[in-house]
From Swiss-Prot:
GO function terms (MF aspect): alanine-tRNA ligase activity; aminoacyl-tRNA deacylase activity; ATP binding; tRNA binding; zinc ion binding
Entry keyword ATP-binding: yes
InterPro entries: aa-tRNA-synth_II/BPL/LPL, Ala-tRNA-lgiase_IIc, Ala-tRNA-ligase_IIc_anticod-bd, Ala-tRNA-synth_IIc_core, Ala-tRNA-synth_IIc_N, Ala-tRNA_ligase, Ala_tRNA_ligase_euk/bac, DHHA1_dom
Compartments in which it is found: Cytoplasm
Reaction catalysis annotation: tRNA(Ala) + L-alanine + ATP = L-alanyl-tRNA(Ala) + AMP + diphosphate
Keyword Disulfide bond: no
Principal location listed in the UniProt entry: cytoplasm
Protein source organism: Christiangramia forsetii (strain DSM 17595 / CGMCC 1.15422 / KT0803)
Cofactor: Zn(2+)
EC numbers for this chain: 6.1.1.7
Lineage: Bacteria, Pseudomonadati, Bacteroidota, Flavobacteriia, Flavobacteriales
Function: Catalyzes the attachment of alanine to tRNA(Ala) in a two-step reaction: alanine is first activated by ATP to form Ala-AMP and then transferred to the acceptor end of tRNA(Ala). Also edits incorrectly charged Ser-tRNA(Ala) and Gly-tRNA(Ala) via its editing domain.
Protein name listed in UniProt: Alanine--tRNA ligase
Chain sites annotated for binding Zn(2+): H563, H567, C665, H669
Family, as annotated: Belongs to the class-II aminoacyl-tRNA synthetase family.
Amino acid sequence: MKSQDIRKQFLEFFKSKSHTIVPSAPMVLKDDPTLMFTNAGMVQFKEFFLGNSVAKSNRVTDTQKCLRVSGKHNDLEEVGHDTYHHTMFEMLGNWSFGDYFKEEAISWAWELLTEVYKISPENLYVSVFEGSDDRDDLGLDTEALELWKKIVPEERIIYGNKKDNFWEMGDQGPCGPCSEIHIDIRSEEEKAKTPGRDLVNMDHPQVVEIWNLVFMQYNRKANGDLEELPAKHIDTGMGFERLCMVLQNTQSNYDTDVFTPLVGEIEEITGVTYGKSEENNIAMRVIADHVRAVAFSIADGQLPSNTGAGYVIRRILRRAIRYGFTFLNTKEPFIYKLVPVLSGQMGATFQELKSQQNLIENVIREEEASFLRTLDQGLILLENLMKESKDKTISGEKAFELYDTFGFPIDLTALILKENGYDLDEKGFEAELKKQKDRSREATAVSAGDWIELNPVDEESFVGYDKLEADAKIARYRKVESKKKGEMFQVVLNKTPFYPEGGGQVGDKGILMSSDGEVVDVVDTKKENNQIIHFTKNLPKNTEAEFKAIVNKTERYNTASNHTATHLLHQALRSILGTHVEQKGSMVQSGYLRFDFSHFSKVTGEELEKVENFVNARIREQLSLDEQRNISYQEAIDQGAIALFGEKYGDSVRAIRFGDSMELCGGIHVKNTSDIWHFKISGESAVASGIRRIEAITGEAAMKYFEEQTNILEEIKSGLKNSNDPVKAINNLQEENINLKRQIESLLKDKAKNLKSKLKHEVKSINGVNFLSKKVDLDAAGIKDLAFQLGEEIDDLFILFGAEQHGKALLSCYISKELVKGKDLNAGQIVRELGKYIQGGGGGQPFFATAGGKNPDGLNEALQKAESFIK
């Protein structure tokens, strides 16, 4: 059975059980402070489990793309080394929100596996929660046990502990016991030796969990206590790749048609055959898995970067590159070539892979090229560390510096050291890594208290599109603490005009004012699990009072101006550069706007001018806002609205139109484009391969910019001889400056020529080396030029020049190439050693290197010590 058919049968089965099929949510999460990636099928339904929203359908099913690489669900290090862990995977699931419970969940799971997929019951085992004797004091899940007894023999029921059979969303929130279904796909001979039940949850590659049925019936409070949920829910998840392994009768997920096209392409590109060597097998599995994770992340809008979710994606891709580099001998970018195979294989189910294919290929290719350069640099640095080591051991601190500063993988460091007979201080490295993780954890740790319910509401009313003020009451609040922001309060109102951060737009600020005049500042607004959360530094004295919720008008108007400008900018770019342009990210706040978009070359000055003129023309046209709320998604698309990639849209959406610009958008906008006043581009740059960024200002910021430019112009004119024609006056100054530079260069050349003749007579021979150590009055470029000229005329030459420039010290070392080879001299090592005398450091090539320092008084001692390197 093909994987596409397996997926389809699952969804159709639950559709026949009155479930609504819903699309996968994005794998990359944008508005969830607790998660960077969707790591389970239930993530997109958290708001229903938490009771913050009411589901439109109380029975749903889907296939959800997931990523597990960090935190509690961290499968990264296992990936490739076994045959059933993955970073990116599909989770097939069915959910009940307060509708059916254990009986239906269990019976339907068994029906699908044994009657639809025709899996032999003889190969299946099930587990139930055995209870716990800790502070929760939970008993055996007798309800699930009795239900399973009606279906399977008792010897196939396993009693599981809290670790395996009690599922929790996190430190707080809905949770409950679960039943896992495991399958034994070993040979009959192996089954006869060891019963399958003895291998359940023992990390056996052929006795694996395929389905987890979670019975959400409790809520974990901030103090650790459990309480019964008012409504009970079902949350199930089945690993699609593992199911394919079972139904396609293979011994590995990587032998299914989910992975074989990718593995085959890797074989074709590298010339290495899968199955001949375990090292090669692991490398191929790592690459086949990781390209999926990276491609889906980029398709969902997350580019590789040095922070947050982007860093996780970069780390996954670099792990794949490193395995190819080390075990498949790939020294050129090649992983990007797998993207068309992946797109052809999964693009029908996940359309974003097809629509974003060019971008994915370009980003991966550029990342590969960049990291391969890093690997080359790291190899040189590691080689130098080995040469400097006297006891054939590289310290954990140095290895961590290679890893942290230069991005050089620690396991590659360990492998190279081992091959060269060196040891790595692994404990020292782990200690440094732990310090870094502790610092990061401490900086980002947030502790949250329980919600205090005052005036419970099913769903908060947002009135911010029409009003900047609203009468409100506090529905609930809780205290949160973090090292970065200290103690704060999260407040949920029954009605609010405050727009929460989302869609690239920052959250509103403002105040809550009680009837007796007390004012509480709202410093930020965010959305979490479908709740609009207002962040305050303190609570009002009377939390039961009625309040005026008032948004900061100035910040709101400026932000709205910038947001509308991004829509006009998007239209301008598509009109001038081409319809290939797609928005890839944005930041809209009161002071400026930032807009990222797909385009594969630098935007020229002429093109930027056209873009700016296009937007300002729309501003002068005084286009009115045409807003459609609660329009169906399909109707909006049919009208020509642009939907942004990586965004999750519901059945009904909000469409924003200004003239011919129409986009799906939940943000705040001006009523008329004339309110923007003016649009001015302040910068254009590259974000990643195929992604450009434009920064711009509007309104008050643009007005202030023009005032500053006018003042600068007046200041320039006042300092010129011809203030009536400043351009001509500046051209004259530039021409005069060029002539003076030429004269100075000519004088310096004469000086260096005379100095070279003089220095040739000061060279002395020591142990077969022509040696010169001298303080000179030249800049860095002049010193380098002089050293190489002397090197061309004198063989076996060792030079150390010192110079003082602008109160700083400079050392430059030149060594003839024959000395580098014959005497094992290294200019880079020498300047690093001598740099301590000038309170500085440096490096470079073995034949030429420089060091800078803040202590010119140490130059003479450094110059004197140079001779010791050849004695």
